[in-house]
Amino acid sequence: MTKKQKKMLTRIIAAAVLLILLNFLPVTGIIRFVLFLIPYLIVGYDILKKAWKGILNRQVFDENFLMAVATVGAIAIAFYEKSGDFNEAVAVMLFYQIGELFQSYAVGKSRRNISELMDIRPDYANIEQDGSLEQVDPDEVEIGTVIIVQPGEKVPIDGVVVEGTSTLNTSALTGESVPREAKAGDEIISGCINLTGVLKIRTTKEFGESTVSKVLELVEESTSRKSRSENFISKFAKYYTPAVCYGALALAVLPPLVRMFAMGAAPQWNDWIYRALTFLVISCPCALVISIPLSFFAGIGGASHEGILVKGSNYLEALSKTKYVVFDKTGTLTQGIFEVVGVHHNQMEEKQLLEYAALTESASSHPISKSIQRAYGKELDRSRVSEIEEISGNGITAKVDGRSVAVGNVKLMNRLGIPYKSCHKVGTIIHMAIDGEYAGHIVISDVEKPTSKEAIAKLKQAGIQKTIMLTGDAKQVADQVAADLGIDEVHSELLPGDKVEQVERLLAEKPAKANLAFVGDGINDAPVLGRADIGIAMGAMGSDAAIEAADVVLMDDDPLKIVKAIRISKKCLGIVYQNIVFALAVKGVCLILGALGIANMWLAIFADVGVMVLAILNAMRTLFVKKL
């Protein structure tokens, strides 16, 4: 509990004890009134203060005003009737504050899930100077600086390990409890905790651009984006509260006047004013105003604990209505780790063909280029390469040792007018031409992720109507992967722009109430991520583009996290609708009973505080998503 919560709990206990003791004291009249005023003010002075400030600021109609009017009115009736029954007024304020304390604790609990993620923020970075370590502010570390991370410390800035081996705890970012190995040459992201060895890391980004900064910025902004349900409840409360206040006023005034002037009967002012005050307590919209945002907040907190970062409750709500999921193949359903599985050459020797291909691809960071460089396995002398030109969706041309080399797909060969040989093997075929003559081709294969097939099956179980895969790979390769994984629809041999067109087409074809989610690995996917109803970036650790463009960011590359994200969103929305129906139904029944004089102030307390506590308890279930 926070200091503020402990103080409130002390006030509640003190007021409750006094209320019980006062009922055993044989006092009447003004003394009884003064004595009961003590627990009333102990527990409710801040509510009265807020209500008065609201009146002064012309923001009258809120829950503080309702509670203040209802309790002061109840005291006035008891005082006027000389009944001495001030219990109801004190009890209303007491139970209302119990509900507020409960709500504060619930929000704090859900916020702690996000706060745990906030703990990834590093306090310092170690730099070696004159043989000793100096702690500096991460903001002061420039790109290219070698920092030292000791066991137990957080990695402050993204970089590459230049010396040392260790294991890293990435659970705060990914939700994955298994430590990750790190060695020289490995890329490493900020926010991880170094567990074992000392690591020397050469920074590749400034602190403000590092993964930890991007993630924290995303999480901090997530609570500001409200869902349609939250906006509806906010607007509802804006008009609902004044309406019930005027309704209560009408209930207090009109029936007595009708009795007096139309029926010639006694007006029974006290009875109708009491009904109106009961009506006010029942009508307090706390259960809705508190539990709906809390459901989304807890849902976002629970998701973040699992390495699923949702940029706002509006995206969580939209995700629950997803019926179409479109995948980019490479790095999403497959590992994106390509391997050369065959080199078919003409007159040039295999080693030389692979060398020329590796040199031509040496400036590219594409996974296929990296696989060719790995297959060559030797250090590349880039001074031998010049006039490099990358043709999007086709391949690369360059001069190697003065010779014209073209490395790419069938489209590149057709573009250059070079006859090529087809290959019977399933995989990505990289054709090569040297000095305008066909030199052979390299067969590269991507490996499917072990959980991709299970993820597709579970998505369908979760209510996804259609799964679609988009890829730039050859039709033969794409069809094989789609068949293996159980994908419903596949579109192959696409350029980056073609993927946007395909998503546009799917958006036009789908039903209006069904959302379309696009899942990519964040590399060259920004336009499509932004165009889909929901953009999901998977394996986004270290990818600025993914974090910027996506609506939902999965911090590791497990396709099953997509299923979990959708299940979390559905659970969250289900709880939101449960709370709305439950709160409105109970309040509706109690309001009718209150207006008819059947319900008293004690039932009103249940209709207000009881419903609020039950709704909050239900909302807190969105925190528990581990087993989804």
Which role fits each region the language model picked out?
Residues G247, E509-K513, A550, M555-L628:
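Membrane-embedded transport module
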Residues G29, F36-Y124, E128, E140-I147, ...:
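Actuator/coupling domain of P-type ATPases
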Residues I20-F33:
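Short, hydrophobic transmembrane alpha-helix segments
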Residues G402, T428, I434-Q578:
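Conserved ATP-binding TGD loop and adjacent catalytic N/P-domain core of P-type ATPases
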Residues I12-A16, N231-M263, T278-F296, Y577-F606:
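Bilayer-spanning, highly hydrophobic alpha-helical transmembrane segments
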Residues V340-K466, K475, D484-V503:
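P-type ATPase nucleotide-binding
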Residues W52-F61, Y105-E116, L294-S313, T622-L628:
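Juxtamembrane helix-loop transition segments at the membrane interface in multi-pass membrane proteins
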Residues E63-T71, L173, Y274, C284-T360, ...:
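Conserved catalytic phosphorylation-site environment of P-type ATPases
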